[in-house]
């Protein structure tokens, strides 16, 4: 498991109803596993479209689910269907949200600019990164691969599209953990502003396994999105919502 059951404030999960979520981490850190777990909180009446290179996502309990898979070119170099092609097609299929297994190139433009900023704000994807700030830098680079815009415009789009970055890692004992959950506050003073909500604190070893806790560091500040997700004012300020 990823060792997070019962440790994450329900407010973070509830933001998944309407917030853009990006999962980051290295190879084998559990990004796809956690994305599957996060998808359990998607309202069951939504229309979901998943897009992958190879089918790995296991979205359960959603009746209106469309799975799209990329395809390599044939021996003649024809017939390829890319992740970017599929995102563009998915946008015409009237989804409530789009879930992309991994973005790694110019398709980031369509995921950020077209999907997350145009009525599909609960969309999610994964990507390789060393920490939340590194994830932002990689997203900037990938968007620059696909569109000619000033960096400031790209940063503003990313800041508007994303609400939460969840960073996962594989520790030296081979366990996989959520290491940090970060809120994207917006664009200000020439940069994307972040706030750490939770951070994994290592507490030692027991029977060869790393023990630790995902410690809460700050409250979510995006009050309007929590209200839109169904939280009451009491819930935002510490109640159960």
Residue ranges: model-predicted function:
Residues 52, 59-62, 90-189:
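Conserved P-loop NTPase nucleotide-binding/switch module
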Residues 8-11, 235:
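Intrinsically disordered, low-complexity segments enriched in serine/threonine/proline/glycine
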Residues 24-27:
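P-loop (Walker A) phosphate-binding loop of NTP-binding proteins
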Residues 174-241:
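NTP-binding/hydrolysis catalytic cores, primarily Walker-type P-loop NTPases
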Residues 36-88, 135-139:
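P-loop NTPase switch/communication element
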Residues 33:
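Conserved structured catalytic cores and adjacent interaction surfaces
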Residues 30:
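Conserved glycine(s) of the Walker
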